[in-house]
Amino acid sequence: SHIGIWFFLVPIVLTVSHRMIPFFSSRVLDNYVMVRPFWLLWFMLGLIVVHGCLQLMEMLAYLWILDLPLALCAFYLSYRWGWTRSFRAKLLAVLHISFTWFAISMVLYGLQSLIYMQSGKIVFGLAPLRALAIGFFTSMILAMTSRVTLGHAGRPLELDRLTWILFLGFQAAAILRIIADVSSAAAAIMPQLYIIAGLIWLFAFALWAI
């Protein structure tokens, strides 16, 4: 699974995001300047590949060296791409929110690595992976597919209410899964949170796919 995630999924979704989010933003926001620094993209892709190698070698204590810079790069791109301005249009906002999950996941991976280096304990469980898989991958699939479909169909570039609600469902599922792994206060109801998050994700994805 590490090979598929770090050598395939993350590089592809990151590259598509780097190319398309500024482009789509330029079609909606006035006086928008596209920022797509390719040197930064290649730098991030390099860090991602090394992260994957360290994961395969189970060298978790050193992941923070890669993941925290990745988080900073992602937050920087979100800022330069106009994160706050994107909320003027929901169809654009979902793209920016989805990309933010990549930065959040890298923060969680980095912090977990630092704590593991000091204590030898995995304190966040699978929370970083949930932020990456549910928050980033799933949300970006919905956001990008919705934008591309509307554009190619010649329909108004507006996100309908149902798709917006389903997108919020993905956000809720990601947050619940992260809380279940991170919060000690939620330990007693962890199985219930897993079930609720899973059902929300399945329901939202099924409705969107239909």
Task: Go through each PLM region and give its residues.
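Juxtamembrane membrane-water interface segments of multi-pass membrane proteins
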Residues: 1, 15-37, 53-65, 77-96, ...
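Alpha-helical transmembrane segments
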Residues: 1-13, 125-136, 199
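Hydrophobic core segments of alpha-helical transmembrane domains in multi-pass membrane proteins
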Residues: 3-5, 64-73, 197-200
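Small-residue-rich segments of transmembrane alpha-helices in multi-pass membrane proteins
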Residues: 9, 36-47, 94-107, 164-174
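Alpha-helical transmembrane segments and their membrane-interface exit regions
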Residues: 9-14, 69-79, 139, 202-207
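Core segments of alpha-helical transmembrane spans in multipass integral membrane proteins
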Residues: 10, 19, 100-103, 130-148, ...
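Hydrophobic, membrane-inserted alpha-helices
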Residues: 46-52, 73-76, 173-177
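Specific transmembrane alpha-helix
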Residues: 70-79, 96-106, 136
